């Protein structure tokens, strides 16, 4: 990480690079989620960027973000995103915006892996407040993606 400027007492990076392979995936909600550019990894202050990979038949369980909007960009495969129970089909090179507080579930009903890049912003006041599960997660003993702290 290169330091070029200061914001108050916090050092802010002018640029920071993270290899996806260097970030351990979380399987807590289903699929494979990696929080890439985060407050803890690069000092991000306004949101964070991540990657989700879902094998055919996998899904990310329903949840919502009380403080944040979610931006999704599908780079491979196809997905069904259920937003408040309504299905939105997402194909490769399509993007979806989910406003804060909306319940959403991400499903790969296709026969090839799906890969999606997501951005969540603004940040919640504390990482543990930023995500609320609304259905049981398939791997409750697994750690959530590391965003802060």
Curated annotation (Swiss-Prot):
Its EC number is 2.3.1.235. The keyword Transferase applies. Pfam families: Cupin_2. One of its GO terms (biological process) is antibiotic biosynthetic process. Pathway: Antibiotic biosynthesis; tetracenomycin C biosynthesis. GO terms for molecular function: transferase activity. The keyword ATP-binding does not apply. Residues 51-117 form the Cupin type-2 domain. Disruption phenotype: Deletion mutant can still produce tetracenomycin C, but at a reduced level. Keywords: Antibiotic biosynthesis, Transferase. It is an enzyme of class 2 (transferase). Residues 127-149 are annotated as: Disordered. The tetracenomycin polyketide synthase (TCM PKS) is composed of a ketosynthase complex (TcmKL), an acyl carrier protein (TcmM), a cyclase (TcmN) and a probable second cyclase (TcmJ). PANTHER family: 16.7 KDA PROTEIN IN WHIE LOCUS (PTHR36114:SF1). Involved in the biosynthesis of tetracenomycin C (TCM C). Part of a type II polyketide synthase (PKS) that catalyzes the synthesis of tetracenomycin F2 (TCM F2), a precursor of TCM C, from malonyl-CoA. TcmJ, while not absolutely required, greatly increases the tetracenomycin F2 production. It probably acts as a cyclase. This is Tetracenomycin polyketide synthase protein TcmJ. The lineage of its organism: Bacteria, Bacillati, Actinomycetota, Actinomycetes, Kitasatosporales. The gene is tcmJ.
């Amino acid at each position: 990480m290169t330091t070029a400027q200061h914001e108050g007492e916090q050092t802010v990076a002018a640029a920071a690079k993270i290899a996806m392979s260097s970030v351990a995936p979380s399987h807590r909600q289903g699929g494979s989620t990696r929080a890439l550019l985060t407050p803890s990894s690069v000092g991000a202050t306004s949101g964070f960027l991540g990657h989700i990979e879902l094998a055919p038949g996998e899904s990310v369980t329903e949840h919502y973000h009380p403080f944040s909007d979610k931006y999704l960009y599908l780079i491979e495969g196809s997905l069904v995103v259920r937003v408040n129970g309504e299905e939105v089909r997402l194909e490769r090179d399509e993007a979806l915006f989910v406003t804060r507080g909306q319940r959403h579930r991400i499903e790969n009903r296709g026969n090839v892996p799906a890969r999606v890049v997501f951005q969540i912003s603004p940040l919640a006041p504390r990482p543990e407040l930023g995500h609320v599960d609304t259905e049981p997660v398939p791997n409750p003993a697994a750690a959530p993606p590391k965003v802060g702290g």
